[in-house]
UniProtKB/Swiss-Prot annotation:
Residues 116-127, 176-196, 248-270, 326-356, 406-420, 442-450 are extracellular. Residues 784-798 have a biased composition (Basic residues). Residues 662-690, 776-798 are annotated as: Disordered. Glycans are attached at N342. This is Sodium/hydrogen exchanger 4. The gene is SLC9A4. It comes from Homo sapiens. GO terms for biological process: gastric acid secretion; glandular epithelial cell development; monoatomic ion transport; potassium ion transmembrane transport; regulation of intracellular pH; sodium ion import across plasma membrane; transepithelial ammonium transport.
């Protein structure tokens, strides 16, 4: 039985035995192959290790690819900065050609070097870099430093010209070029209508920065300057909105036809994008102004708040497909008025110069990249398209200028003359904006992109080099109306006063104009906005606040430049220094030291401290504040003493004589008693002079007054004639110490008119009293009294 079973299942057993043998042989082959592969790899690694040199710590290594982009960009900016320095060292060169010409030439030089060495330039310009990093600083600088008053006075004409002018130029150039493209002989049949309209929108973006520099030097009238400035400020935003809308239409046309509904939706979007961007900017401007209200203890971050909120308004608007350019412009205009009131003077200086620096760097990079792009093989030259583009730019610019200003002149009090319109037409210079938009055209939608870029470069070179250089001689040839000289503080105050007066007259007459609108906005601003957004309580009167701003500005200029300003409240220019200088005797030096000790401002002892988040005030800022405080105190005392007539008595015009000191109040005994007991005890310094005020009879105290007015300078002027203190005491008292001019530091008495009839006829009512200033001097006052009493013409009747 067992044998039978073995015989029966023997074939299967044999098959199983064969399979087992095959598996064992296969596994042995795999093991051998794996071992051979591992042995081969090991041998190869050892061979490679033996062939390579041994690595160690190298003293010098070169990895240029790692730093190529920032390194070359830094060199570009440094080269342009050095070129600017050399450009402005020769004072005649800026008057002959604009600065943008220099930057383009530097870029062309760099491009020639790159092209000659067959080196690939770094990707400085693409869509994200331009719109997110290069464009915002340029727009922010233009909006922040915009002169708000003349801009809003001409806001109607500026909007009329900037918006409609950009639309007319874009549509006119695009339609005209589309007609040229229909001519088969020119070989432009593949350029459709949308592509021509898009090119017309980007080529109509003007950049009259060079023209504005020429206008500033030529001092053209204010309204002409503001029209060009307003066009430069708003034209970029309008052009970019139109550019993006036509890009969307081009993408849509690639897959489907454009209908009338799409065109109407695009027009509505144009309005929504512009107004939405402006509203976003206003909101962010108010927020930034409100936050700077609480930064008095951490002033180091004040510039950061200004820049971050401005940039955030741009990014937030772009996130919602609104106009970021108009948003950052509105934010800058809104925040400037309130931020300057809250931040410190050091922070304001930082904001001003850092903003200028960022704008200059961005424009430099764009112009240099324009010059780099000029030299190369990425151009398509079509004579017909380029020449007609240049011609249509000039033709449609002229049509839009003369047509729009003919209409606007019908509603203006001061219309633009034909000469002004010619200058506006000639100032249509294309620049960085047009080139950037042309360079960023998507190649998938524009197969003839190289031709568009070439035509844009030709238009830019023509307008910058030809029109930018010749606009100065044209202004002088046409004899365009010039602006007046720089207004003084007195003129500024009277202009503000006349604004209030005109607003009141318009309110009475029922007339409505920008004076009344501005006056209502100021009331709303003082009632609500300033209380919320500004930290300090400034004077309620706008005239007083304007005076304070102008005084602070003038004081800072006096400190920084060292030159006394020529405005209405400036100190008169001093006499020239005497050439011969004598050596002073020890007695003279001691007398000078005594006088200076009793008259000069004492240095206040302060405990020095350090705060990481606050900037140390500059010396010029302290000096400016000290000058402002002294000047305000002087003016306050002058206004207080300026009531020279007896109380309650009308002014007379006869028998006027002049005294050295003004009258007080003769009818108030209590006021005289308080004045007699008043003394300056606020000064904690022991060397400061004590000042007392006393009321006494004008006639009885005349000799004492004369004795106290004379400074004992005769002992310091041995061999000289006694010095007479006449009319000079009203401005600045000068003594010559051994041939050296010195200004006496003592209170400045003012001369006031007194009615002599009131003196002679009012003996029974009480004599006029004189508030005199008694200064305690260390030297003897007796020298020169008789001479002064006998020769002073101010104490005699006229």
């Amino acid at each position: 039985m067992a044998l039978q079973m073995f015989v029966t299942y023997s074939p299967w057993n044999c098959l199983l035995l064969l399979v087992a043998l095959e598996c064992s042989e296969a596994s042995s082959d795999l093991n051998e192959s794996a071992n051979s592969t591992a042995q081969y790899a090991s041998n190869a690694w050892f061979a490679a290790a033996s062939s390579e040199p041994e690595e160690g710590i190298s003293v010098f290594e070169l990895d240029y690819d790692y730093v190529q982009i920032p390194y070359e960009v830094t060199l570009w900016i440094l080269l342009a900065s050095l070129a600017k320095i050399g450009f402005h060292l020769y004072h005649r060169l800026p008057g002959l050609m604009p600065e943008s010409c220099l930057l383009i030439l530097v870029g062309a030089l760099v491009g020639g070097i790159i092209f000659g060495t067959d080196h690939k330039s770094p990707p400085v310009m693409d869509s994200s870099i331009y719109f997110l990093y290069l464009l915002p600083p340029i727009v922010l600088e233009g909006g922040y430093f915009m002169p708000t008053r003349p801009f809003f006075e001409n806001i109607g004409s500026i909007l009329w010209w900037a918006v409609l002018g950009a639309l007319i130029n874009a549509l006119g150039i695009g339609l005209s070029l589309y007609l040229i493209c229909q001519v088969k002989a020119f070989g432009l049949g593949d350029v459709n209508l949308l592509q021509n309209l898009l090119f017309g929108s980007l080529i109509s973006a003007v950049d009259p920065v060079a023209v504005l520099a020429v206008f500033e030097e030529a001092r053209v009238n204010e309204q002409l300057y503001m029209m060009i400035f307003g066009e430069a400020l708003l034209n970029d935003g309008i052009t970019v909105v139109l550019y993006n809308m036509l890009i969307a239409f081009t993408k849509m046309h690639k897959f489907e036809d454009i209908e009338t509904v799409d065109i109407l939706a695009g027009c509505a979007r144009f309005i929504v994008v512009g107004l939405g961007g402006v509203l976003f900017g206003i909101v962010f401007g108010f927020i930034s102004a409100f936050i700077t209200r609480f930064t008095q203890n951490i002033s180091a971050i004040e510039p950061l708040i200004v820049f971050m909120f401005s940039y955030l308004s741009y990014l937030a608007a772009e996130t919602l497909y609104l106009s970021g350019i108009l948003a950052i412009t509105a934010c800058a205009v809104t925040m400037k008025k309130y931020v300057e009131e809250n931040v410190s003077q050091t922070s304001y200086t930082t904001i001003k110069y850092f903003m200028k620096m960022l704008s200059s760097v961005s424009e430099t990079l764009i112009f240099i990249f324009m010059g780099v792009s000029t030299v190369g093989k990425n151009h398509e030259w079509n004579w017909a398209f380029i020449c007609f583009t240049l011609a249509f730019c000039q033709i449609w610019r002229a049509i839009s200028v003369f047509a729009l200003f003919y209409i606007s002149n019908q509603f203006r009090t001061f219309p633009f003359s034909i000469k002004d319109q010619c200058i506006i037409f000639y100032s249509g210079v294309r620049g960085a904006g047009s080139f950037s938009l042309a360079f960023l055209l998507p190649l998938s939608l524009f197969p003839r992109k190289k031709m568009f870029v070439t035509a844009t470069l030709v238009v830019i070179y023509f307008t910058v080099f030809i029109q930018g250089i010749t606009v100065g001689p044209l202004v002088r040839y046409l004899d365009v109306k010039k602006t007046n000289k720089k207004e003084s503080i007195n003129e500024e105050l009277h202009i503000r006063l006349m604004d209030h007066l005109k607003a009141g007259i318009e309110d009475v007459c029922g007339h409505w104009s920008h004076y009344q609108v501005r006056d209502k906005f100021k009331k709303f601003d003082h009632r609500y906005l300033r209380k919320i957004l500004i930290r300090k309580n400034l004077p309620k009167s706008s005239i007083v606040s304007l005076y304070k701003k102008l005084e602070m500005k003038q004081a800072i200029e006096m400190v920084e430049t060292g030159i006394l300003s020529s405005t209405a409240f400036s100190i008169p220019h001093q006499a020239q220094r005497i050439q011969g200088i004598k050596r002073l005797s020890p007695e003279d030096v001691e007398s000078i030291r005594d006088i200076l000790t009793s008259n000069m401002y004492q240095v206040r002892q302060r405990t020095l401290s350090y705060n990481k988040y606050n900037l140390k005030p500059q010396t010029s800022e302290k000096q400016a504040k000290e000058i402002l405080i002294r000047r305000q105190n002087t003016l306050r005392e002058s206004m207080r003493k300026g009531h020279s007539l007896p109380w309650g008595k009308p002014a007379g015009t006869k028998n006027i004589r002049y005294l050295s000191y003004p009258y007080g109040n003769p009818q108030s005994a209590g006021r005289d008693t308080r004045a007699a007991g008043f003394s300056d005890d606020d000064s904690s310094d022991p060397g400061s002079p004590s000042i007392t005020f006393s009321a006494c009879s004008r006639i009885g105290s005349l000799q004492k007054q004369e004795a106290q007015e004379i400074i004992p300078m005769k002992s310091l002027h041995r061999g000289r004639k006694a010095f007479s203190f006449g009319y000079q005491r009203n401005t600045s008292q000068e003594e010559y110490l051994g041939g050296v001019r010195r200004v006496a530091l003592r209170p400045k008495p003012l001369f006031h008119a007194v009615d002599e009839e009131g003196e002679s006829g009012g003996e029974s009512e009480g004599k006029a009293s004189l508030v005199e200033v008694r200064s305690r001097w260390t030297a003897d006052h007796g020298h020169g009294r008789d001479h002064h009493r006998s020769h002073s013409p101010l104490l005699q009747k006229k």
